[in-house]
Amino acid sequence: MNLIVEICSPKRKTKYDLVAVHKQDLGWVNMDSQAPNKVVGEWLAKQGYDYIRPEFTYGKSRIDFYMEKGEQKYLMEVKGCTLEVDGIGYFPDAPTERGVKHLHELAQAQRKGYQCAVAFVIQMEGITEVRPNVRTQPEFGTALAEAKAAGVQVLLLLCRVGRDSLEIMEQRKG
């Protein structure tokens, strides 16, 4: 069972969006590529930051979120995890040079005094672990390990997923 939504816009290449799929062992898997940033923005608003700015330019990248709390500056890149194999989430589900670039930028920013994190929004229920999908893109696994070594935090954001909803329920360190 899938949830497909018709979008009428002359600017689009396609007329429909795949919003969710129903997987027998997992239930609903949210496939909306824009949902992770939306729910993280809502979640960050409840985390006590003094200032939150989406789509922040750092270096040669657009990082998903810039935040401030007191004197401390934060950068967060958001990744939506929709691939599951044997109860484990994997990212990316397709090669992403942009994702590798963002991890390098976060590591550099961390070394310059920012507090940086990459947040994996797990877009399905019952998954509590996300691993780099080195089979699809080994460079992402290397870049993630280097970012962690530089002090970049890895956050796992566990969600409640409905047919047309996604809500962050729990944060864990990855």
Question: Where in this protein do the model-derived segments appear?
Answer:
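Short nucleic-acid-contacting surface segments enriched for D/E, G, S/T with interspersed K/R
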Residues: 1-4, 102, 107
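Flexible glycine-rich surface loops and low-complexity tracts that mediate binding to linear polymers
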Residues: 1-11, 158-159
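Basic nucleic-acid-binding interfaces
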Residues: 1-3, 26, 117
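OB-fold/S1-family single-stranded nucleic acid-binding modules
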Residues: 10-25, 168-169
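Acidic-basic catalytic patches of nuclease active cores, encompassing PD-(D/E)XK
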Residues: 25-54
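Conserved catalytic cores of phosphodiester-cleaving nucleases, focusing on short active-site segments
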Residues: 63-93, 106
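Nucleic-acid nuclease catalytic cores
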Residues: 87-97, 107-136, 158
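Domain-level recognition of nuclease-like catalytic cores that cleave nucleotide substrates
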Residues: 123-174
